[in-house]
């Protein structure tokens, strides 16, 4: 199918312009990277602190990406139940851990690729429903 052909070419035949852009990004100024690292570190600390303050929730500090994956078993809800509750009652989108396999039960994934203000608002909304 067409999608397969596109994927094969996209994954194995990266065009020259994209390759040159990648080189420029790697060899160019890195000050933006340092700024992003600091911003994501602050957001990570914020969300982990807020998650650990929620009743029945326990979150270790993630070491990569921009996702927190707290244990929610203390809430008495399944991952799917809590995902739905947060979306429907608090307007906060998360991903049930079971979306990543059966061993994800008891966990919900949060993204902290958002502003600190958005994270604060989301955590406040969740605190109001738990």
Which residues make up each language-model segment?
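PLP-dependent class I/II
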Residues: 1-130
């Amino acid at each position: 199918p067409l999608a397969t052909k596109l994927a094969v070419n996209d994954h194995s035949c990266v065009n020259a312009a994209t390759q040159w852009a990648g080189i420029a990004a790697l060899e160019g100024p890195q000050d933006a990277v340092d700024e992003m690292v600091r911003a994501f570190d602050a957001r990570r600390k914020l969300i982990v602190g807020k998650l650990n303050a929620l009743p029945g929730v326990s979150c270790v500090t993630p070491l990569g990406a921009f996702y927190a994956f707290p244990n929610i078993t203390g809430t008495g809800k399944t991952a799917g139940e809590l995902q739905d509750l947060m979306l429907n009652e608090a307007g906060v989108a998360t991903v049930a851990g079971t979306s990543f396999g059966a061993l994800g039960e008891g966990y919900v994934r949060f993204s902290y690729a958002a502003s600190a203000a958005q994270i604060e608002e989301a955590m406040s909304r969740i605190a109001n429903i738990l």
